[in-house]
Amino acid sequence: MQSLLSLQDISYAYHNLKGETPALSHISFEVSQGEFLAIVGPSGCGKSTLLSIIAGLLKPEEGNLYYNGNCITGCEPNDAMKIGYMLQRDHLFEWRTIYQNVILGLELNHSLTQQNRDYVLQLLKDYELYAFKDKKPSELSGGMRQRAALIRTMATHPDLLLLDEPFSALDSQTRLNVSADIAHIIRKTNKTAILITHDLSEAITLADRVLVLSKRPATVKCEMPIQFSVERHNPMEVRNTAEYQLYFKHLWEVLTNEQSVFQST
């Protein structure tokens, strides 16, 4: 598969009056077109920092990033880089309705066509938010707000999705169903996605490959390709397979030396 994104020797440190705190150290990996990559690692190891660098929100102190073969280090996202970034918090505007929130990216991109309006309305129906499209965010539960934020991310048709623990606000059952649905949509539309998560089960169930980071300053500790003999649309069926148990055991053993507690659902 063709590489959509390539990181080469990326390093980054935070600076303040007391000195610097190294966050990332010589990170290198590639993400292929249509691949779903999950990144796990100890809390505070720099996973979100890495995602911010990919999104162009932070500039690495060392190394380069390439998108479709073009160097994008320090560049702001443009039309050639169709990146959708979903943060841990929903960041919905309380004075706008849910529909007005999910079309915000289309408005900013001057691409609010009738076709895109119809696409957004279909997403609202698919995620059971159509009946709430005229409601304000304060009238929705945390899980519903997070689904609205995800629709806002998908509305601009990004080629690369950056997902920073997007399901963390959902209850366990909803999280299982929504995460499986999103992964199915991403694969069906051949989107490329990078998921940051603390949940090893989620990483194994959703991803084509899991990248494990060490404690700060983070380095790539290992990579694990993920394959199952069953369809992934049913998360509980996947978690009952022998492959899942082996992947989980191996990841847990790799992370044991990092002395970090991970969530398992």
Where do the language-model regions lie?
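Helix-to-loop junction immediately C-terminal to a conserved catalytic motif
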Residues: 55
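Conserved ABC transporter NBD signature motif
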Residues: 63-74
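ABC ATPase NBD coupling module
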Residues: 72-89, 108, 235-241
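Conserved ABC ATPase "signature" region
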Residues: 114-132, 184
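Conserved ABC ATPase signature
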Residues: 136-140, 144
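A short, proline-enriched helix->beta-strand linker immediately N-terminal to the Walker B motif
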Residues: 155-159
